[in-house]
Amino acid sequence: KFLLYIKSEGCSVCEADFPKVKEITDKNNYTSYYIQADEMAEAVGQLNLYTVPVVILFYNGKEIHRQARIIDFSELDYRIKQTL
């Protein structure tokens, strides 16, 4: 299980949301990975990403939750807790 946070350079929303996402994952001792969309075009295509920021939760090798552009942090925290 892990969280993937995708952002891009020059995205002010991405920079504002990043510490909030990190706080939630740290608080829940949840594995997380962060990637720059503009540096990983292949991953962007494989994950069907059309906007940033994007948060994707994976559990047992499958995507179980995705939020894009506007992240609901209470929903994200709830979804993470469901997998603990």
Task: Give residue ranges: language-model regions.
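Non-catalytic, surface beta->alpha helical segment in thiol-disulfide oxidoreductase systems
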Residues: 57-84
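Active-site loop signature of alpha/beta-hydrolase-fold enzymes
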Residues: 40, 52, 64
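CheY-like receiver
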Residues: 43-47, 79
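Short alpha-helical
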Residues: 12-13, 39-42, 71
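Thiol-based oxidoreductase modules, predominantly thioredoxin-like and allied folds used
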Residues: 6-7, 25, 29-43
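Local sequence-structure signature of Cys/Sec-based thiol-disulfide redox active-site neighborhoods
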Residues: 1-24
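Structural micro-motif
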Residues: 47-56
